[in-house]
Structures are given as C-alpha cells and as structure tokens.
C-alpha cells in the first residue's frame, strides 16, 4: 500500500510531465506575436531614423539601437525561451534542469545583492550605535562611514559565516527583551 502511494506520488510530481506548451507558451522563435513585436520595434526605430540625415550622431545612434534590438530578439529566439500570446518571453520554473538557468542565476544574484545591502546596513547601524548621537547618524548618513561599509560588503557571505561560527552574529538570550504580557 505504502509503495503504491509512493509510486503514485512520484509519477504525479515528475517534472518531465509538466509541459509548458500546454499552458499556451511556444518557443519565441516560432511565436508570431514575438516576431510581430520585433518588426514593430524595428519599424518605430526606423521611423525615428527617417527624421535625421545619414551619418549624423542621432542617425548613427539609432542604427546602433536597431542592430541591438535585432540582436536581442535573435538571442531570445536562440535561447529557447518560451513566449505567451502577448509575444513576451516567460520564465518557466517547473523543476526541469534545462530551464534552471532562466531563474537560478538571477535568483542567486538577487539574494547576493539583498544580502549585501542588509549586511552593510547592519554594520553601519552597529557602528553608529556606539557614537554620541546614533539617532542623528541614522537620519543624516555619515557618507564616508557608509562608503567604508559598502566597499567591504562584497564579501558579506564569508563575514556572516565567520560571525555565525564565532557566535557574534546571534544575540544571547539575556540581550533579548521579553514582553511582560
């Protein structure tokens, strides 16, 4: 009985069964709406380009932008991204490792950046708490001090692990106030 339940659970949760095309998503290179978006984007840029003489700085900039637009759309098409009926690429996070690069790297980068911001802010607040006017330094930032913390924040995962393993990261129970209720 338990083996049957386990087998049924494995079959139902198999990520290979999940098919994004069923949800109305198609590869961007095959999407008519995606190709229409590219054509419309290029047409708008070409309409702006027609207002300028050739070899002028605005015309050169617009030509460069047209090439970048074509390259961007071609890259999306080659990357195997899936597009919806709106012609926009959609990220799929259904557990297939073939789609992991679409969201794992940006997700890890987001966590790193938010951790950096939090670690730098924590360091700044702990530092200004030791000054004579900590509230004032929280409202009016001490920019040189903040820059010092910002420049050292890139190694925050190592610093956090070091403080955690030494016991400095977590406050002792005696330092935590408890409500009398």
UniProtKB/Swiss-Prot annotation:
Cleaved signal peptide residues: 1-20
The biological process GO terms on file are: photosynthesis
Membrane topology, as annotated, equals: Single-pass membrane protein
Database matches in InterPro entries: PSI_PsaF, PSI_PsaF_sf
Subcellular location, record wording: Plastid, Chloroplast thylakoid membrane
Q: Which Pfam families match?
A: PSI_PsaF
The record ties this protein, via PANTHER family, to: PHOTOSYSTEM I REACTION CENTER SUBUNIT III, CHLOROPLASTIC (PTHR34939:SF1)
Q: What does this protein do?
A: Probably participates in efficiency of electron transfer from plastocyanin to P700 (or cytochrome c553 in algae and cyanobacteria). This plastocyanin-docking protein contributes to the specific association of plastocyanin to PSI.
**Name of this protein:** Photosystem I reaction center subunit III
Look up and give the organism this protein is from: Pyropia yezoensis (Susabi-nori)
Lineage, uppermost ranks: Eukaryota, Rhodophyta, Bangiophyceae, Bangiales, Bangiaceae
């Amino acid at each position: 009985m338990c083996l049957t339940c386990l087998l049924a659970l494995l079959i139902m949760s198999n990520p290979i069964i999940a098919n994004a095309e069923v949800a109305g998503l198609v590869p961007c290179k095959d999407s008519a709406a995606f190709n229409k978006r590219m054509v419309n984007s290029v047409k708008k840029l070409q309409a702006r380009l027609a207002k300028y003489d050739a070899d002028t700085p605005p015309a050169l900039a617009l030509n460069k932008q047209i090439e970048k637009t074509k390259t961007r759309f071609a890259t999306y098409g080659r990357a195997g991204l899936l597009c919806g009926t709106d012609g926009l690429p959609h990220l799929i996070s259904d557990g297939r490792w073939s789609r992991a690069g679409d969201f794992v790297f940006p997700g890890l980068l987001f966590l790193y950046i938010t951790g950096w911001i939090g670690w730098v802010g924590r360091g700044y607040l702990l530092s200004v708490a030791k000054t004579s006017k900590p509230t004032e330094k929280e409202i009016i930032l001490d920019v040189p001090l903040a820059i010092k913390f910002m420049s050292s924040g890139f190694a925050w995962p190592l610093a956090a692990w070091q403080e955690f393993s030494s016991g400095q990261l977590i406050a002792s129970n005696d330092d935590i106030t408890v409500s009398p209720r």
